[in-house]
């Protein structure tokens, strides 16, 4: 894929850097690698002079951004098709701005009805935090629902500060290229990594170290793990938990009432965030926080934090820069270790090759046979591959699912040390 580098000076936002290269807006058919969080990619699209559909991975960022302007529409589980139809008909909004979850996208398509093809011709489609397609598709297949529609838009782009490599052929077929933002200053942040065999003791010691901090933000992708920490450290009266509504329900059943599903101020002294808050959302504070990232592999593998994406995204949630030009006091990641038995890259290559051979054989036999019983049997066998998230809902090869397996290989094996 062709790569174009664009310099970003210290006093510039993304749109300034783009304009220096002759782009008035985010161009079409690009994967925009911002390098830095918080430089205004979504902001640029929301304020562009064109109609836009912006796909965000989770609800909190959608609700937060749409609340800033009554001319922007948030589409998620609570939004009805009728509300979207009403918005599309508004004549007082010159440039429509629709922010939607991947799951909410089908409501936009349904609301547009016969005008949907016109929307694909005239709206710019921006898929924000695009690495989530690869990272989340194994447990959240619905995140891929808009993918086919996305590539049917005349103008579209992927964007993230931490994009992953994507193998879907459509990128090459449609001539996608990468725009790489290159900051002209040292933007690195110090992170204190603590690898321990005594997770509970180390976490307790870290909380003791942070007892005088005005605000501690803890990122741990386990509602159960958060609940255990709150109880064992007796933080009930001075903590808040930010998680999904489902997670909040579990906490309520456990007797914890101070859990919310979107950013809500003021924050407490101790604030816990699950993975839906790792990217995209803005956390605005009047005090400089201490950030603590926790990975407990003995509790759950899904508490693993990807150092190439999630760790970068987490520290980027904090937008306010204080007098010392910093956005936080400290950034610490505590993790234990465990042999996860993951495949090596070489082993995974062989496994994927076998899947593809099996798929090709089954699909050819399925297309050739006219016997309904045989078709049913072959379709069931294809669905078995689909259950391993290597086929999508149309029974085509799911390249994001394959990319997910390679990303896990990098994350969970010693191969990561070679990258």
Located regions from the model:
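Interdomain hinge/linker at the junction between the two RecA-like core domains of SF2 helicases
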Residues: 169-203
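SF2 helicase motor core recognition
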Residues: 38-43, 106-111, 271-289, 313-317
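Conserved small/polar residues in nucleotide/adenosyl-binding loops
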Residues: 412-419
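Conserved helicase ATPase motor motifs in RecA-like P-loop NTPase domains
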Residues: 33-39, 131, 147-169
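Inter-Walker segment of RecA-like/P-loop motor cores
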Residues: 72-109
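Conserved strand-helix element at the start of the C-terminal RecA-like helicase core
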Residues: 52-62, 210-231
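SF2 helicase catalytic motif II
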Residues: 117-144
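Conserved SF2 helicase motif VI
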Residues: 299-322
């Amino acid at each position: 894929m062709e790569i174009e580098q664009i310099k970003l000076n210290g006093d510039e936002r993304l749109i300034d850097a783009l304009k220096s290269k002759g782009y008035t807006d985010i161009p079409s058919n690009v994967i925009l690698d911002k390098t830095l969080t918080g430089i205004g990619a979504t902001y640029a699209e929301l304020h562009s002079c064109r109609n836009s559909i912006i796909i965000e991975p989770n609800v909190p960022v959608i609700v937060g951004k749409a609340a800033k302007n009554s001319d922007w529409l948030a589409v998620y589980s609570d939004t009805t098709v009728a509300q979207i139809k009403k918005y599309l008909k508004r004549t007082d909004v010159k440039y429509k701005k629709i922010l939607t979850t991947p799951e909410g996208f089908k409501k936009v398509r349904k609301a547009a009805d016969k005008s949907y093809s016109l929307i694909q011709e005239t709206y710019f489609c921006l898929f924000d935090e695009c690495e989530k397609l690869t990272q989340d598709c194994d447990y959240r297949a619905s995140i891929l629902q808009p993918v086919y529609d996305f590539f049917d838009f005349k103008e579209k782009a992927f964007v993230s500060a931490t994009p992953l490599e994507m193998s879907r052929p459509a990128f090459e077929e449609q001539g996608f290229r990468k725009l790489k933002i290159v900051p002209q200053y040292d933007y690195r942040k110090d992170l204190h990594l603590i690898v321990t065999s005594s997770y509970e003791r180390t976490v307790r010691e870290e909380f003791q170290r942070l007892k005088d901090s005005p605000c501690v933000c803890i990122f741990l992708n386990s509602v159960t793990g958060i609940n255990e920490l709150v109880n064992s450290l007796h933080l009930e009266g001075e903590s808040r938990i930010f998680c999904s509504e489902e997670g909040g329900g579990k906490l309520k059943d456990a007797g914890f009432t101070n859990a919310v599903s979107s950013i809500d101020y003021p924050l407490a002294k101790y604030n816990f965030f699950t993975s839906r808050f790792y990217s995209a959302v803005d956390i605005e504070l009047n005090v400089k926080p201490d950030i603590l990232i926790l990975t407990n592999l003995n509790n759950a593998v899904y508490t693993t934090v990807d150092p190439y994406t999630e760790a970068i995204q987490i520290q980027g949630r904090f937008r306010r820069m204080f007098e010392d030009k910093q956005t936080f006091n400290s950034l610490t990641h505590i993790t234990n270790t465990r042999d996860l038995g993951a495949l090596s890259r070489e082993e995974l290559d062989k496994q994927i090759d076998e899947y593809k051979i099996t798929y090709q054989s089954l699909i050819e036999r399925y297309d050739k046979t006219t016997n309904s019983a045989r078709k049913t049997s072959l379709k069931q066998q294809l669905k078995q591959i689909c259950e391993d998230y290597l086929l999508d809902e149309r029974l085509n090869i799911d390249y994001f699912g394959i990319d997910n397996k390679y990303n896990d290989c990098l994350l969970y094996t010693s191969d990561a040390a070679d990258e």
